[in-house]
């Protein structure tokens, strides 16, 4: 990505996101302005998770992974992430570390807690937490993001890396490509 001047204030980045979301919703009404703003909050979070590029062992799954491939797919309420090679607690610690990455965009993601969410007899090869982060732009709380974090049985097909198809047109924000859980494996899990 070419060097661009970042937004100088939290209000500036917030206004740019709102304007881009309105324009995008006018062009494609499958998602409304508020859903697109929330999607940008997801992207700000995921740009931190995938900030290590090809070195990353994180994979995006679920509805957010679908939106990254097909921009007019249904809106989703959470982010599904898979981490290879870590225990669940190690993955949680790594997620918290990555969420604190400063991308110069005035966003901050504050860990708010987690609870056991998957595993046990129903899913013996997978362990997971439902993790909550508070979203801040500057010092103002804006939203809450829930992440379904999973470790365990990994994908059997090739991982793809791509820019999110649902991204808003915000060239002054640092964005990192997502590593996407294979579609065939995602379907098999359902």
Predicted stretch roles:
Residues 1-190:
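Compositionally biased terminal segments of proteins
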């Amino acid at each position: 990505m070419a060097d661009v001047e970042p937004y100088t204030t939290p209000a500036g980045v917030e206004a740019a996101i709102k304007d881009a979301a309105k324009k995008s919703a006018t062009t494609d009404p499958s998602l409304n302005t508020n859903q697109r703003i929330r999607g940008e909050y997801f992207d700000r979070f995921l740009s931190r998770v995938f900030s290590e590029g090809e070195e990353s062992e994180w994979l995006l799954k679920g509805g957010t992974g679908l939106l990254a491939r097909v921009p007019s797919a249904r809106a989703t309420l959470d982010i599904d992430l898979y981490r290879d090679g870590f225990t669940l607690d190690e993955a949680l610690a790594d997620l918290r570390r990555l969420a604190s990455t400063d991308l110069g965009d005035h966003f901050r993601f504050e860990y708010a807690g987690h609870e056991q969410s998957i595993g046990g007899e129903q899913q013996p090869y997978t362990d997971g937490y439902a993790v909550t982060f508070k979203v801040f732009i500057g010092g103002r709380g804006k939203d809450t993001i829930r992440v379904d974090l999973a470790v365990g049985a990994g994908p059997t097909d090739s991982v793809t890396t791509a820019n999110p198809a649902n991204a808003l047109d915000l060239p002054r924000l640092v964005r990192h490509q997502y590593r996407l859980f294979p579609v065939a494996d995602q379907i098999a899990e359902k």
